[in-house]
Amino acid sequence: MGDSRDSRSPDSSSVSSPPSGQRSPPLAPSAAAMTSLPPITSAVNSPISSMGSPFSVISSSLGSPCLPGTPSVGYGPISSPQINSTVSMSGLHAVSSSDDVKPPFGLKPLSSHSPGPMVSQKRLCAICGDRSSGKHYGVYSCEGCKGFFKRTVRKDLSYTCRDNKDCLVDKRQRNRCQYCRYQKCLAMGMKREVVQDERQRSVQEERQRNKERDGEVESSSAANEEMPVEKILEAEMAVEQKTELHADGSSGGSSPNDPVTNICQAADKQLFTLVEWAKRIPHFSELSLDDQVILLRAGWNELLIASFSHRSITVKDGILLATGLHVHRNSAHSAGVGAIFDRESAHNAEVGAIFDRVLTELVSKMRDMQMDKTELGCLRAIILFNPDAKGLSSPSEVELLREKVYASLEAYCKQRYPDQQGRFAKLLLRLPALRSIGLKCLEHLFFFKLIGDTPIDTFLMEMLEAPHQLT
């Protein structure tokens, strides 16, 4: 008896015999058969164990059915034909991944892998079974059923069923019977009051937006009262009339062969009208006299360039001076320009380059956007109220006036050109070009032959102290 035990393989000792009083499994192998079959553990560890999901499902679900030392499964020898068939090689080959292998009664199956979080979170529409896009009106539903229920409640629609009011509502047939679909929405828990509350909120939001728009209109009208664009336009028109009078009386004596001289003469005459224009701009005369002089001295060149650039919109490849003369691009590049610049002939190219910049960066842009005189006047008022001018006694007051012009111009653009949302920004983008070109013109053009030998500060002071000279 002891010799027979010693002659068995080591693994066969792990196979326990059934306790006394219990019937042996009908298919349990005999000792002779055990010696001819490979050990169970070796079968588990053999390449067959890597066959795939069928074997792993069986082994993980049941453990080692023939081993009594397995603590996790509190069962004795199991006589299930399913389990006994797994011992034989032929039984292993008969199992496929599609077979429904069930554990013994009372044994909870253990899946080989737990479902991922995305799988567990997928929900279907409670009405038609399509993929749910979330919880709508109290029920997980798809976008189609959500929209159907929303339209039905908001429009207070009523439907009738052509059959027995028990139509199938699924993903394919949900549009066949609107009555049954709506009844199923209600039956699954969709709430009409949620749709109605949503409608009320949207109405309230629309009212709030209307109030905000009304507030914008009120604020823009308030800004216009503080800096009325009508007054700014009046100042522009008064200066334009004065310019036309100058042009009628003095155009005959100018020489078109000397464009720089013509420009300087135009600047000379325009300084008189510029001071009159500034006096007509709202709140400018309320500043101290010294601050008025500082602002005009800091911005007069940009103010004049803005004026003749806008005046030249109708001229092709040239500018129209206040004297009424046209200066063509070719004239600015001609040799006659160098007559004033005897000391440095290099200035010829500089003057031609400045002229080209005026045409491309100012005249052309103003023409393309069809800048009107009100917008021109507001841009010039922004240039005039320069809080960065050196020597101001009250720069904060000047900055406040500039901000009022900004607000009035923006309100004017919204009211006059409602379809051009970027127009206000386009207008402001002309200011850097005016600044840059103005600095270049100061270097090369306008100080020549300017009001004789009179210092510009003295001239401006006398003009500002004088009463209005434009009628």
Swiss-Prot record:
Bias (Basic and acidic residues): 196-216
Tissue specificity: Shows uniform expression from the blastula to mid-gastrula stages. At 12 hours post-fertilization (hpf), expressed ubiquitously but more weakly. At 24 hpf, restricted to the ventral diencephalon, pharangeal endoderm and trunk and tail mesoderm; mesoderm expression is in medial cells of each somite along the dorsoventral axis, forming stripes. At 48 hpf, expressed in forebrain, eye, midbrain and anterior hindbrain.
GO MF term list: nuclear receptor activity; nuclear steroid receptor activity; retinoic acid-responsive element binding; zinc ion binding
Record has Nucleotide-binding as a keyword: no
Region Hinge, residue ranges: 198-221
GO BP, one annotated term: nervous system development
Region feature (Disordered): 1-34, 196-226
Localization terms from the record: Nucleus
Ranges annotated as biased composition (Low complexity): 10-25
A GO cellular component annotation in the UniProt record: RNA polymerase II transcription regulator complex
SMART domains tied to this protein: HOLI, ZnF_C4
Renumbered zinc finger spans (NR C4-type): 125-145, 161-185
Region (Modulating) residue spans: 1-102
UniProt keyword terms in alphabetical order: Activator, DNA-binding, Metal-binding, Nucleus, Receptor, Transcription, Transcription regulation, Zinc, Zinc-finger
Portion annotated as DNA-binding: 122-197
Purpose of the protein: Receptor for retinoic acid. Retinoic acid receptors bind as heterodimers to their target response elements in response to their ligands, all-trans or 9-cis retinoic acid, and regulate gene expression in various biological processes. The rar/rxr heterodimers bind to the retinoic acid response elements (RARE) composed of tandem 5'-AGGTCA-3' sites known as DR1-DR5. The high affinity ligand for rxrs is 9-cis retinoic acid.
Subunit structure: Homodimer. Heterodimer; with a rar molecule. Binds DNA preferentially as a rar/rxr heterodimer. Heterodimerizes with rarga.
UniProt free text on domains: Composed of three domains: a modulating N-terminal domain, a DNA-binding domain and a C-terminal ligand-binding domain.
Recorded family membership: Belongs to the nuclear hormone receptor family. NR2 subfamily.
Protein name: Retinoic acid receptor RXR-beta-A
Organism annotation: Danio rerio (Zebrafish)
